[in-house]
Amino acid sequence: DINLQEVDLTNKKGNIMILNFWASWCIPCKREMPSLEKLAKNSPEIKVYAINMEKPNKLRTRDFYKSIGITSLDIYFDPEFKLVKQFKMRGLPTSILIDKNGKEFARVVGEIDFYSEDFQDFIKKYY
């Protein structure tokens, strides 16, 4: 999390989770963030983890969020790349969707509009 405390995702079962891996230098990451925030605000049944893949820096990340109009997404880091290794990630942005039982059910490598009708229709199948 923002304080570099480990977050146990196994304790989050029961909710759909989106693990969104991003970096401030990644243009597609910047473009998709507003729709990710909108999804997080309007879909309480989905827990969103926006994970900054850069060197952990709370102030810089807050400034980045502010520069693109993000006001309510929590900040997470993966400084030891544990999640990157666990999910065998390649490239940014990457979004991993996890069902209520803790199993990955989809992965998007590249930019996505999280609030599009197509995405909404898809993810509702897993509520």
Predicted feature locations:
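A generic structural signal for alpha->beta connector loops
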Residues: 15, 45-46, 72
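Structural microenvironment flanking redox-active thiols in thiol-disulfide oxidoreductases
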Residues: 30-68, 79-86
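Short, ordered coil/turn segments that flank beta-strands lining enzyme active or ligand-binding pockets
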Residues: 1-3, 12, 100
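Conserved Rossmann-like nucleotide-cofactor binding loop
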Residues: 24, 56, 103
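Short active-site neighborhood of thiol/selenol oxidoreductases, capturing the structured segment around
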Residues: 8-30
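Hydrophobic beta-strand anchors of alpha/beta hydrolase catalytic cores
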Residues: 18-19, 48, 95
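Thiol/disulfide oxidoreductase modules built on the thioredoxin-like
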Residues: 66-72, 78-123
